[in-house]
From Swiss-Prot:
Enzyme Commission numbers on file: 3.1.3.11
Group of enzyme by EC: hydrolase
Annotated localization: Cytoplasm
Lineage of origin: Bacteria, Pseudomonadati, Spirochaetota, Spirochaetia, Leptospirales
Gene (name only): fbp
Organism field: Leptospira biflexa serovar Patoc (strain Patoc 1 / ATCC 23582 / Paris)
Pathway membership, UniProt: Carbohydrate biosynthesis; gluconeogenesis
Listed name of the protein: Fructose-1,6-bisphosphatase class 1
Amino acid sequence: MNATPKQKKLISLSQFILEEQLKIPHASGEFSALLSHLVYAAKIVGREVRKAGLLDDILGATEDTNVQGETQMKLDQYADNAFNQSLKICGHLCVLASEEHEDIIPIPGGYNIGKYTMAIDPLDGSSNIDTNVSIGTIFSIHQRLEPNSKEPGNERDLLQKGHLQRCAGYIIYGSSTMLVLSTGKGVSGFTLDPSVGEFLLSHPNMQMPESGDIYSANEGNASYWSPEVQAYLQKIKSIEGGKKPKTARYIGSLVADFHRNLLKGGIFLYPNDTKSSKYPNGKLRLLYEAAPMAFIAEQAGGMAVTVKGERILDLTPKDLHERTTLIIGSKKEVEEFLTFVAK
């Protein structure tokens, strides 16, 4: 007689956070409450993303540009507003920063000042919205420099090294909506069950494969890359000696490309180039793109460095929108890249 298969225990994000909180002596619950406000906004954004093809007022571009000089998509503005409104009045932040705002977003008067900071890219990969490609939200949480202060936070509270992050993660809006996060004790993935409106633990203890066969890069710019990066690219594509070349997979959405490589193994490259003098140090933002993704990568056993070989998590941002190069992925793949930088 066949035994009845053991039913998988479903753990909600709320339960997971509570259980983790109980492991910390004298935990106040402030951090858990902050995450609940983040998740609430993510559910709202995810709902609108799923309906994007049906609503004329969500798809397409606006006439506005953000601080980066990029044309804002309608869903960009919607996502920014959803996270902004949910987070700045939650009572657990002292200051907030967003890709869509040039300056810090202060906590409005009359609301509690918390001990955490958050930097967020409300909608990464938004240029892909109209083509139904996976997009995402990236966030980074630090504890403020003076955790007992009840004064509003400032830019200094945000400009901390990546390895000091208390939590980092991303939400990917794809065939399902998934939240991947780390509080410095490994990486966990939660998938949204729309029938109950809860994120459920679907990927416990996520580990990036030590090596992988995938590389992700915009090779259309390869001629503008440094000789070292070009040499590395030729090496991984080479069939010399009967070697199997790596497979190219590039979506053009950092969250989507990274998420695939986190699960399957591989390397993502976004070097600087000579195509334009606008981004001499790279294009990705250190504070709310590179640093949180690097935190996730390292917690999952991977690596993240600049094109010069600097560890991303050791860099101190000089301003909110500082840009950087990013080489991130499986440990052995990044280590191989570093051998070309060292030459």
